[in-house]
Amino acid sequence: MTPNKPWDDKKEMITTALESGISYVLDLDDYDKIQKLGNVKIVANSDDADIYLVGINGEGDGSLILSEDLNQSQDLQEAKKAKREGKTVCAYVEITDKNHEQLAVSLGSVADYIILISTDWTVIPLENIIADLQKADVKIIAAVADEDGAKLAIETLEHGTDGVIFEANDFNQIKKIAQLVVDASKIKYDLKVATVTNVKPLGSGDRVCVDTTDMMKPGEGMLIGSYSKSLFLVHSESLESEYVASRPFRVNAGPVQAYVMVPGNKTRYLSELVAGDEVLIVNTEGETRTAYVGRSKIERRPLILIEAEYEGKTIRTLLQNAETIRIVDADNNPLSVADIKIGDKVKVYVESNARHFGIAIDETIIEQ
């Protein structure tokens, strides 16, 4: 939320927010000016806004008296009308009593986003509203006043809150809260140690180099494999070699049919990746961060098959057969495909759920 300040001060706040990765701004006064600052989604009670706002200057913020009969709610009727007109709708509700809690639930069944404001969530726990909206297709945004409030709200993320909104007061506050949200959204994968059971040089195939917009450090790479539910940690080209200069932004990922883990615990085929797509960078501890594809390079190269076993499950991947291509061993050291041998211990990720269109589902699918 933009502060009630002169435009020049507000502009600096919004610019800092955009640089910190914040992409939504709620503002009622300077829609046209904000549009010129960058690619940002503006939430406002204007027909031209990216997201149409209901609730401010209405029942949501207490400007209008809320009837006990929610069917008579002006905010609810306005939200329904906006949805019929094809707008993306955000509802704003200050939770001051049980009646406004019910208004939030009703609006949540209509709106695409709902902003919830409360001075004390111990009076009406946020979890109550989340539980009531569990089956609704709405993103729940909790309003916070400061960094401590953001930390508290972020702890609730796992229970159903989709984000936070705050009024910008200073530049450090913006950066700290933005970083909190980024850190909370990171997934950590439980990497296992598998035993190599087969190493087989093959002929040539089309392999993909994923060049990202980030510089990776030693120990970082991507989760890649022939099976969507069992992936090797393939190391980045962040190490120096006597044969070629390092390319810390690159993962020589494997052939076109291989899967790669991307944000949201989804997988994609390497052949699908294009500039601008998101991918996950993973380190030896399973910690992740999001990066963007700057370029995907497909070239004909000799391949090598690597098979490993974990708790009776066979894991396979194909990689380019070159000394500079590495996976990661059990001691978190890069292991060149030129040096891999049967019996080596390597880092893998294995999940029990199958995947449908890259999304994990509880279903039996056999891959071999």
UniProtKB/Swiss-Prot annotation:
Disulfide bonds: none annotated. InterPro entries: DHQ_synth. It comes from the Archaea. Keywords: Amino-acid biosynthesis, Aromatic amino acid biosynthesis, NAD, Oxidoreductase. GO terms for molecular function: 3-dehydroquinate synthase activity; dehydroquinate synthase activity; NAD binding. Its EC number is 1.4.1.24. GO terms for biological process: amino acid biosynthetic process; aromatic amino acid family biosynthetic process. It catalyses: 2-amino-2,3,7-trideoxy-D-lyxo-hept-6-ulosonate + NAD(+) + H2O = 3-dehydroquinate + NH4(+) + NADH + H(+). Catalyzes the oxidative deamination and cyclization of 2-amino-3,7-dideoxy-D-threo-hept-6-ulosonic acid (ADH) to yield 3-dehydroquinate (DHQ), which is fed into the canonical shikimic pathway of aromatic amino acid biosynthesis. Belongs to the archaeal-type DHQ synthase family. This is 3-dehydroquinate synthase. The gene is aroB'.
